[in-house]
UniProtKB/Swiss-Prot annotation:
<comment type="similarity">
    <text>Belongs to the bacterial ring-hydroxylating dioxygenase beta subunit family.</text>
</comment>
<comment type="pathway">
    <text>Xenobiotic degradation; biphenyl degradation; 2-hydroxy-2,4-pentadienoate and benzoate from biphenyl: step 1/4.</text>
</comment>
<comment type="function">
    <text>The beta subunit may be responsible for the substrate specificity of the enzyme.</text>
</comment>
<keyword id="KW-0058">Aromatic hydrocarbons catabolism</keyword>
<dbReference type="Pfam" id="PF00866">
    <property type="entry name" value="Ring_hydroxyl_B"/>
</dbReference>
<dbReference type="GO" id="GO:0019380">
    <property type="term" value="P:3-phenylpropionate catabolic process"/>
</dbReference>
<comment type="subunit">
    <text>Heterohexamer consisting of 3 BphA1 subunits and 3 BphA2 subunits. A ferredoxin (BphA3) and a ferredoxin reductase (BphA4) must be present to obtain activity.</text>
</comment>
<protein>
    <recommendedName>
        <fullName>Biphenyl dioxygenase subunit beta</fullName>
        <ecNumber>1.14.12.18</ecNumber>
    </recommendedName>
</protein>
<dbReference type="GO" id="GO:0018687">
    <property type="term" value="F:biphenyl 2,3-dioxygenase activity"/>
</dbReference>
<keyword id="KW-0223">Dioxygenase</keyword>
<dbReference type="InterPro" id="IPR000391">
    <property type="entry name" value="Rng_hydr_dOase-bsu"/>
</dbReference>
<dbReference type="InterPro" id="IPR032710">
    <property type="entry name" value="NTF2-like_dom_sf"/>
</dbReference>
<keyword id="KW-0520">NAD</keyword>
<keyword id="KW-0560">Oxidoreductase</keyword>
Amino acid sequence: MTRVAMAQKTAELIQEFAWPAQPVSPQLQHEVEQFYYREAQLLDHHNYNAWFDLLEQDIHYWMPIRTTRIKRENDKEYIPAGANAHFDENHETMRGRIRQRTSELNWAEDPLSRTRHIVSNVIVRETDTPATLEVASAFLVYRNRLERQVDIFAGERRDVLRRANNGLGFKIARRTILIDQSTILANNLSVFF
């Protein structure tokens, strides 16, 4: 990807997710929301292997670093794709993260964090590619660890979902996590969004 293309893609992140010209059917909206609720449940109950099965082989899981800018530099609010990021993962690196999370030697998560993933404001768009959807959703992730450590992460996820015969109806092909915080005060980012 050229620098110009990366800059354009990054500038698109600050734009609101466009509403579809035609709303999707209530049935499809319901299916997508139910998928997200089940995904949140898997994460909150530390069922990481089942969650990993929801990721497509060509997954791109990306959380760009957000910076605070003045209005005229708003298009530079996110660090460009291909540069540093909180997460910039593919299927293999996500497998490594899951392996680490489920290991008994994972000190960052021993004892386990208690999390609650809340997903709302789900906007679904159909695409020209069959069985593929673009979805935006708002999230709030609450984490309590040890006795007094509390972290709250808020933001927007922009996903590409593909139809799948996996009992939940979809798999995640792309996830871009647009976190609201420019400075993350948590001790670590050992949670999935």
